[in-house]
């Protein structure tokens, strides 16, 4: 019996993003087959480069088709400003972004977890969430330290308001919960 003709698989989709050297474009593979399933992965510290990667993928998938996107998270957190950029894009795109905690969603990563579609956020049974208030590390002249402290307080106020909206908790409860490193199981985070 004759053999069937071999089928060709589609090449993996690639997303362009600019790397730190401003004259070089680099193509990246989006975590294997996950990309074709509209799955994105945040699995490291939140910094400008990582957020630019996730944002580029989110925007590309949204431009390709308005449909559910899934953001899996296992991150220690990181830059508040970079995280807020991802939050803004998640709210901007037409595609619903469903978030899932698959390990640790700490600090800014917990905020991104909460930014997913309400009622569709997922935390695996052994995952953990940690929230706390934003931190700064200013050094130098007293005026510089004062200016940074004011900015941190403004960011804290913004985060408190947004956490309250995302979770349905009161501002007072959110302020209390952010007062220290607050580790929670998946079940405790749900409550």
Question: Which residues make up each language-model segment?
Answer:
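Terminal-region recognition feature
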Residues: 2-191
């Amino acid at each position: 019996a004759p053999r069937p003709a071999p089928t060709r698989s589609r090449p993996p989709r690639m997303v362009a993003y600019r790397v730190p050297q401003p004259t070089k474009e680099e193509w990246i593979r989006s975590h294997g087959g996950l990309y074709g399933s509209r799955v994105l992965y945040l699995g490291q510290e939140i910094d400008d480069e990582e957020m630019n990667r996730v944002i580029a993928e989110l925007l590309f998938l949204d431009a390709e088709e308005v449909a559910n996107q899934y953001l899996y998270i296992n991150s220690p957190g990181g830059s508040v400003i970079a995280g807020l950029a991802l939050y803004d894009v998640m709210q901007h795109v037409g595609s619903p972004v469903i978030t899932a905690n698959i390990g640790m969603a700490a600090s800014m990563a917990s905020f991104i977890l909460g930014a997913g579609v309400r009622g569709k956020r997922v935390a695996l049974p052994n995952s953990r969430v940690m929230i706390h208030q934003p931190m700064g590390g200013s050094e130098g002249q007293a005026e510089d330290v004062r200016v940074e402290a004011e900015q941190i307080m403004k960011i804290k106020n913004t985060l408190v308001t947004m956490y309250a909206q995302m979770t349905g908790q009161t501002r007072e409860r959110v302020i209390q919960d952010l007062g220290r490193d607050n580790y929670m199981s998946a079940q405790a985070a749900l409550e």
